[in-house]
A protein has these predicted regions:
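Core catalytic alpha/beta fold that binds nucleotide/phospho-ligands
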Residues: 1-165
Length: 165
């Protein structure tokens, strides 16, 4: 392994999160048709969160919007024409999943979709922004903003956040 860890399996913590080898941080994502893993040395990267989501089907759109979009995100979707609605909703959902995977190992607490707001205005350049609406820890307070990456490919949306030292 290029990260300096011996060959090993990824364990599962009591909270069902991955237990990475010592000195390694990472994130896992999967759908019915793909699996992806991002790994880094803990000495260089604090946390990583990645997500891959199939584009939300029209039949599921309203339920996903209700579950994961903030009122401001819904309003923004009404005003924007950058992406078809189902693709924008998928991107927001995916970004919140990636954000959770990135921050959970650092804050060690559950937080839901309403704890962050996603700004998609930079999507054309592959950039997304997440702003916390609630304080998760002394370091990650309401108003904290993190920049991530977005890629839309055929039938999937890919998002990622990475915190370096």
């Amino acid at each position: 392994m290029q990260l300096g860890a011996a060959d090993t399996t990824v364990g599962i913590n009591a909270d069902r999160s991955p237990r990475w080898p010592r000195h390694v941080v990472g994130s896992i994502t999967h759908s019915r048709t793909l699996v992806a893993v991002a790994l880094a040395r803990q000495s260089q990267v604090r946390a990583i969160g990645i997500d891959a989501e199939p584009i939300v089907a029209a039949a599921d759109l309203e339920a996903i919007e209700h579950l994961c979009l903030t009122p401001r995100e819904r309003q923004t979707l009404e005003e924007q024409s950058q992406l078809p609605r189902h693709m924008a909703v998928t991107a927001i959902f995916s970004a919140k999943e990636a954000l959770y995977k990135c921050l959970y190992p650092l804050v060690q607490r559950y937080f839901d979709f309403q704890c962050a707001q996603i700004d998609l205005t930079g999507m054309a350049d592959g950039v997304i922004h997440a702003r916390l609406l609630h304080t998760l820890s002394p370091e990650f307070c309401a108003g904290y903003t993190i920049t991530g990456s977005y890629l839309g490919q055929l039938d999937h949306t890919f998002t990622a956040f990475c915190l370096t030292w």
